Amino acid sequence: MGSQGSPVKSYDYLLKFLLVGDSDVGKGEILESLQDGAAESPYAYSNGIDYKTTTILLDGRRVKLELWDTSGQGRFCTIFRSYSRGAQGILLVYDITNRWSFDGIDRWIKEIDEHAPGVPRILVGNRLHLAFKRQVPTEQARAYAEKNCMTFFEVSPLCNFNVIESFTELSRIVLMRHGMEKIWRPNRVFSLQDLCCRAIVSCTPVHLIDKLPLPVTIKSHLKSFSMANGMNAVMMHGRSYSLASGAGGGGSKGNSLKRSKSIRPPQSPPQNCSRSNCKIS
């Protein structure tokens, strides 16, 4: 956990996360999609290890993440046991187009329970842009996550969908577990950055943030701020985040979305992806 004291630091908290799962589930794709991340490993040896850092904004606080991806091959289980020491959060990653990778999550949970017991974890279904090849139903994965007390996300690095949001949610879980609510005083004076973020996300649905004429890093911060503060709740379904959940909102949530759109100038229909070569079925 990072400290708050030193003014030379460019972050308020430092967290170490592990991405675990079978090989070829796209963990490297998730890391590569973090455009503001640094890829240099602080250690001389990196065989079988991918490392990247990125900084997210969580309720106005800068959280630096050290992200470690150990190869999913069996011979790297020893490496996982070594790197699990000091880990504060774990992302269990599977490929929604590969049933075998989902069935293998049980084995990874056993490894985690043995070598990193009590560490917060979330379940991540990767490659949502290949939903037309889906072998793992969303509802089955969500039920599995709830059974194992995990938050569930379906993500697409290619479409920049839910990647930052998944890291933000895991960061919030970790920091809350370490008593973050005692550090963050509810009557603190909001910074200009906080006020600007609140002003923008209060009148912009989260799925339209990508259409704003802003740099990618700022748009990522806005989406993280929105998710961290429970704003734009029409994009949420329980504690799960996926394309399927976006279609389920109704009642007062649907009305709030209509009110948000009514005060904005006419816009073209929202697109699911920010990249032209991506299509989610």
Swiss-Prot record:
Write out the residues that bind Mg(2+).
S46, D69
User: Which Pfam families does this one have?
Assistant: Ras (PF00071), SOCS_box (PF07525)
Q: Region Switch-II: which residues?
A: 72-88
Q: Which family does it belong to?
A: Belongs to the small GTPase superfamily. Rab family.
Q: Where is the lipid attached (S-geranylgeranyl cysteine)?
A: C278
Effect on the protein upon substituting Q73L: Constitutively active (GTP-bound) mutant. Decreased lipid droplets accumulation
Q: What is this protein called?
A: Ras-related protein Rab-40C
Pathway(s) it belongs to:
Protein modification; protein ubiquitination
Q: What is the effect of changing G28N?
A: Constitutively inactive (GDP-bound) mutant. Increased lipid droplets accumulation
**Reaction(s) the record says it catalyses:** GTP + H2O = GDP + phosphate + H(+)
Q: Which residues form the SOCS box domain?
A: 175-228
Q: How does it sit in the membrane?
A: Lipid-anchor
Activity control summary? Regulated by guanine nucleotide exchange factors (GEFs) which promote the exchange of bound GDP for free GTP. Regulated by GTPase activating proteins (GAPs) including DAB2IP, which increase the GTP hydrolysis activity. Inhibited by GDP dissociation inhibitors (GDIs).
Q: What is known of its domains?
A: The SOCS box contains two defined motifs including the BC box that recruits and binds Elongin BC complex, and the Cul box which interacts with the Cullin family of proteins to form a ECS (Elongin-Cullin-SOCS-box protein) E3 ubiquitin ligase complex.
- Give the residue numbers of the S-palmitoyl cysteine lipid attachment: C273
Quaternary structure, from the entry: Component of the cullin-5-RING E3 ubiquitin-protein ligase complex (ECS(RAB40C) complex) composed of CUL5, Elongin BC (ELOB and ELOC), RNF7/RBX2 and RAB40C. Interacts with protein phosphatase 6 (PP6) complex components ANKRD28, ANKRD52, PPP6C, PP6R1 and PP6R2; the interaction leads to ANKRD28 ubiquitination and decreased PP6 activity. Interacts with DAB2IP; DAB2IP acts as a GAP for RAB40C.
Q: Which UniProt keywords apply?
A: Cell membrane, Cytoplasm, Golgi apparatus, GTP-binding, Hydrolase, Lipoprotein, Magnesium, Membrane, Metal-binding, Nucleotide-binding, Palmitate, Prenylation, Ubl conjugation pathway
- Give positions of region: Switch-I: 41-49
The protein's role, per its UniProt record? RAB40C small GTPase acts as substrate-recognition component of the ECS(RAB40C) E3 ubiquitin ligase complex which mediates the ubiquitination and subsequent proteasomal degradation of target proteins. The Rab40 subfamily belongs to the Rab family that are key regulators of intracellular membrane trafficking, from the formation of transport vesicles to their fusion with membranes.
Provide the protein's localization: Cell membrane; Cytoplasm, Cytosol; Golgi apparatus membrane
For activity, the cofactor(s) needed are: Mg(2+)
Kindly list the GO CC terms recorded for this protein: endosome; plasma membrane; synaptic vesicle
Q: Name one GO molecular function term.
A: GTPase activity
Q: Which SUPFAM superfamilies match?
A: P-loop containing nucleoside triphosphate hydrolases (SSF52540), SOCS box-like (SSF158235)
Q: List where Polar residues composition bias occurs.
A: 270-281
